[in-house]
Amino acid sequence: RWLLRDIEDRRDAMLTLYTEIGKTPLDFSVKVDVKSSNEEIATIIRNILELNATTQKSFRTPEKALSYCVTTLEKSDVLVFQAAKIDPSEMRGLSVAYEQMPIIVLNRKDEPSARLFTLCHELVHIVTRTSGICTDTAENSMSLNELELRCNQIAGMVLVPKSSIIKHPSIRDIQTYGFDDLYVNKIAHDFAVSKQVIIHCLWELNIISKQFYFETLNRYSEEYKTHQMKKSSKGFLPPVTDTATQVGKLYARTVLNAYYADKITARDTSGYLLNLKAKNFGKLERWGF
């Protein structure tokens, strides 16, 4: 598939450019037996992402949480790209578990909360060395693939540990006064995740029934569809934003560093940056640095 070829080409370019600018790729040494417990794998991934209750509460939005997690991974030379032209029904995420510069691909057409969930899902594949293309990384997944279901469960535990959510005041409110979207919104806000993730946790904690979970999930899905239909079309993204969101800051910085060090030409740089014109390099630099 063309996407696989593109991301492999980007990784090859990164390795070449690191050599050109005198950098050594970091080893991604975290490796976990796939037979380990879900709790153990989730804890390891939270440590990789440097997530804790205080940090998560400071995010307030899935956008900020996603940005933080991607930046944290890029510090370890994990390449995080975003596909721009693929429908989420075809691919939610993709991962390739290299020992150096492992690759995670998210789908830019997904909402930030969905991309955050997918990022955690793909990290499970990376640390257990079970990478591949994932078409069903939603927290409400009905996938029959046992590994994919496990990855979804672990992703939920990474973002919302049971030990943390049971202490949340709104859990007590739900148990005392009954289910209310206001309580769900408050919990989702504090963990910077979607409402869907939270109601899945409520089901797992036996606070709501399976039937009520799916009824609420369907209602949220319909509300989301209505919201999407009301949103005005944003048209085309500016060239810099288009390139930046697809290749990520680590990749963009590396290419520009090589260019400013006279290791590659402007034409080469443009090619590495999805044919971004040289006049836009400065804007990309301000975004990436």
Q: How should each PLM-predicted stretch be described?
A:
Residues 1-289:
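Active-site hotspot residues in diverse enzymes, especially metal/ion-binding acidic/histidine motifs
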